[in-house]
Amino acid sequence: MTMTGADARVILVANQKGGVGKSTTVAAVAEMIAAAGKRGRRVLVVDGDPQANVTVEDLGVQGDRGQSLAQTLQFNAPLVPVRNVRANLDVIAGGPQLAVVGAGAHLMVDNGIDMAANLEHQLGVLSAAEGYDLVLIDSGPGDVPLLDTYLAVANYLLIPTRDDQASLGGVERLARRFWRARQLGASIQLLGVLLFDVNPRATKRNQDVFDQVAEMLEGSGTTPFDITIRSAPAAAVDMRTLHKTAGELVALADDDRRARLSKLRHHQSPERAMWTSDPTGLAADYQELVRQIVARLARYESARYGERVG
């Protein structure tokens, strides 16, 4: 099965706790898949969060404050993407208009409006027209009606989490929404849980968290991702300040290093444009995550369709 057109996979990235790396993960994975190889893949990011972090902070896009997505959810209006924010990468912007939708969700249900059906229909139309291979939905932590809508639409769920109990509590709450969506007929599958912002040398602590997560996921047919995303505070500041992903920081760090060396050779005071000096390890973490995501998609879809993912 090839990753094209109406066959675009829809991956929801969610956790019912904020600050666990959802938006950062969406941006990093989307950019790497879109840029991979000579042609890359066509990727659409749907920022389903009223805070719009992946739109504004991670990708540096000035969107429509969530207006297009809100109109789709409420009125089945066509989705209007911000095109070519990176090569092969489009964005449906998030923003505060989505908070209005979430607050009025019960009224829409009373009036027979099916937000999930509207979004699923318009995503299918847009994916077929634009030839998207992958759709990544970034979900906010607190708006349950919106979260339930995305769970009903997505094919797969990826859950980033930190190793603290509050974040793991968010995983547990989301797991309950996931199972509820499945009971209501959603076809969504759990792709895996990603441990984010951790010390890779804290192997005992990380294994303890893996064990807790595995217990939460029992019966889901999947396990946590083997890769963890390392803690990199300086790179995190640079990514949000410069609106770049971990992969994009690597080239910028090289340019920054060369510029500072050139100024030193000319006896000038170098100005540091970035806080991080070497983001290659962080970028490698995300590259391995992308590899594992593609491998899991291939395994799931081979079992479902008897074919390999192309």
Which residues make up each language-model segment?
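P-loop NTP-binding core
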Residues: 1-310
